[in-house]
Amino acid sequence: MKKRVLALTMALTMAFLTACSGGGGQSGTAADTGGGESGGASAETGGNSAVDAEITEPVTIKFANYAVLEAGYDVYWNGLLEKFHEENPNITVELVTAPYGEIVNTIINMAGGGDKVDVIFGEKDWIPTLVDAGLAAPVENVLSQELVADIYPNILEACSMDGVAYGVPMYISPFLMYYNKDLFEQAGLDPNSPPTTYDEMLEIAPKLAALTTEDGNQVYPFGLTTASVAVSGACLTSSVYNFGGTVLDEEGNLAIDQGFRDAVEMWKTLDDNGYNPQNSKLKDLRNLFALGQLAMYYDQSWGYNGISSINPDAESFIASAAPLKGGDGTGESVLQAGTLMVVDNGDAQKAAVAKLVDFIMSEEMLTEYFETVSPAYPARQSMADLEVIADSPILAGAADSVSNLKTVTFVPALSDLNLELCTLAQAVTVSGTDVDTAIADFETAARGILE
């Protein structure tokens, strides 16, 4: 029954995304990223022949991937590349690595010096920046038609600008809520009945805040990332959506409304009461959660990997729930995706990239990822019924959230806008600025970025 419910939920997600694609809005112009003649591929890329092309001469491709530096992900990615090389001995994959917060600038700076990578693993929200930098190429020009056609159409559309897809997600997730069942029990709360609204969360927060760990450390009731990294801005956008608010309209214009203001008021309320750790990155919240110092927090589903890497016993106390509803909102959330973006560096590289991406996106490798690294929802239609997902106790509590999504309008300055949202959150928390002044300052800065 659980498998059927999760499969149905996934289908509903796709139906929902039909009505709210993320591919609209202002977009950067994709510069010509092509060049070079074929050096060793005996078939064209961009079609079904791409993956079947025989690589007759050695070719090296550069794969930018921040995750190989992170515990819990490194073993998987290194193992995957070893298996790929065994099957494709003429293809050498050269890793380009940098910490999460630095990888995009590393890629762009390399390109400025004439050294372009061939494929990038990262966040869906990086697409506007990479397109604007003239790096990300249309996936249909590089990857196989079979693979591209298997991605849920509206997920592919959510990775598009001006109707052109620039990425294929390995997996997707909304921002969901993780909570600690053990801490709920210690506070006299029902571990099987997490809050569904921000008001309900605030009602139980004092009981959770009264707890301490065995070594006397404070327990925070609720975590919302506000540190100055782009993914924190995406999470804050999701919080605005929880309240029925808007950041950008469909045309990419700033659209501050009451739901936006209600969300910012909540960020301040959480801080005023000491409920949310100040200026925390997601990795900081994962650490606190793993150590029993955080009762609830927002994260992508794959944040579980960071938690379990710190505390292997986390599976015994972690549970998921849908994002909270606030104000007049319905608890809508932002779609997140671990995404592969490609660069057109000529036919030989394209053929090799097509093979690598197809290997990464294979059922074998995705199943291994979901089993050994972290649960998430596959973006391929052919994998809708994967048992490893249908039977996941980690995803079960938040299953309904994937049918309650609101997409983000892509603009070239999206990453910068996300950072300004972090500045806004820090203003009403760390700096103690009043909400009206902080929002006014945000509007001024955001308009400067968008214009």
What function would you assign to each model-found segment?
Residues 97-106, 125, 196-202, 277-291:
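Short helix-initiation/N-cap motifs at beta->coil->alpha
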Residues 40-54, 99, 122-176, 202, ...:
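Hinge/lid segment of periplasmic solute-binding proteins
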Residues 59, 82, 86-87, 92, ...:
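Extracytoplasmic/periplasmic substrate-recognition and gating elements
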Residues 6, 20-129, 148, 191, ...:
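Conserved N-terminal structural module of periplasmic/extracytoplasmic solute-binding proteins
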